[in-house]
């Protein structure tokens, strides 16, 4: 039996908000730089919480990033000398992101994506479940529940301190002022704001 060492694979980092997804993506990108590999980082234009041209973790770590509006815009920035392509907040990209990631991995790039696997309602979010299914490596991170201290796998959206209703808009970019990590048992999603 022969071991064939081929380049090109997909890594998914997922979990709730405040679980360390961006921090882990930044850590992996920095490690590639120590190995003298060339990396590029992308983020969706919609993510402008801390910076327009950096991926920034909640604890302040950051790495330069190229903001893009559409998934296929990523191809415009890909060059042959690159080894690693990292994409943060992947849940905010359009449906083409799955194909883009597949094409890049098939071309021999190590592709690292990070994003929320569930929306604030606790349902699968965007294209992340599909990316998890096709990835060679999946890392699911957990935060700490802000209510009871248990491992948190959910993201609680708060509006004026109260849980957001099930029918509220799915995408609302924010940080600690509008979201907090919760465990399954402390996570709440009222069916109607009036109830």
Swiss-Prot record:
Q: Which GO terms describe its molecular function?
A: ATP binding; thymidine kinase activity; zinc ion binding
Task: Name the source's superkingdom.
Answer: Bacteria
| UniProt key word Zinc | yes
Q: Where does ATP bind?
A: 15-22, 88-91
Q: Which residues bind Zn(2+)?
A: 145, 148, 183, 186
Give UniProt keywords alphabetically: ATP-binding, Cytoplasm, DNA synthesis, Kinase, Metal-binding, Nucleotide-binding, Transferase, Zinc
Q: Which GO terms describe its cellular component?
A: cytosol
Chemical reaction(s) catalysed = thymidine + ATP = dTMP + ADP + H(+)
- Short name of one Pfam family for this protein? TK
Question: Is this entry keyworded Phosphoprotein?
Answer: no
Q: Could you give a single Gene Ontology term from the biological process aspect?
A: thymidine metabolic process
- What SUPFAM superfamilies does its record include? Glucocorticoid receptor-like (DNA-binding domain), P-loop containing nucleoside triphosphate hydrolases
* Matches recorded under InterPro entries: P-loop_NTPase, Thymidine_kinase, Thymidine_kinase_CS
* The EC number(s) this enzyme carries: 2.7.1.21
Cellular compartments annotated: Cytoplasm
What does the record give as the active site? Answer: 89 (proton acceptor)
Q: How does it assemble?
A: Homotetramer.
* Family the UniProt entry places it in: Belongs to the thymidine kinase family.
Protein name stated in the entry: Thymidine kinase
Q: Which organism is it from?
A: Bacillus cereus (strain B4264)
What gene name is listed for this protein? Answer: tdk
């Amino acid at each position: 039996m022969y071991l064939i060492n081929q380049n090109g694979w997909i890594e998914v980092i997922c979990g709730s908000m405040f679980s360390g997804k961006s921090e882990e993506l930044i850590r992996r990108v920095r490690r590639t730089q120590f190995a003298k590999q060339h990396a590029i980082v992308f983020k969706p234009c919609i993510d402008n919480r801390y910076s327009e041209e950096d991926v920034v973790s909640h604890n302040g770590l950051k790495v330069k990033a190229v903001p893009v509006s559409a998934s296929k815009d990523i191809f415009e920035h890909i060059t042959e000398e690159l080894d690693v392509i990292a994409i943060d907040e992947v849940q905010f990209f359009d449906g083409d992101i799955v194909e883009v990631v597949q094409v890049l991995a098939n071309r021999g790039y190590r592709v690292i994506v990070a994003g929320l696997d569930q929306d604030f309602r606790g349902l699968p979010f965007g294209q992340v479940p599909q990316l998890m299914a096709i990835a060679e490596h999946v890392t699911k991170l957990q935060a700490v529940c802000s209510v009871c201290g248990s491992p948190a796998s959910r993201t609680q959206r708060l509006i004026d301190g109260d849980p957001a209703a099930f029918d509220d808009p799915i995408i609302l970019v924010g940080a600690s002022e509008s979201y907090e990590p919760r465990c399954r048992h402390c996570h709440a999603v009222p069916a109607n704001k009036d109830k």
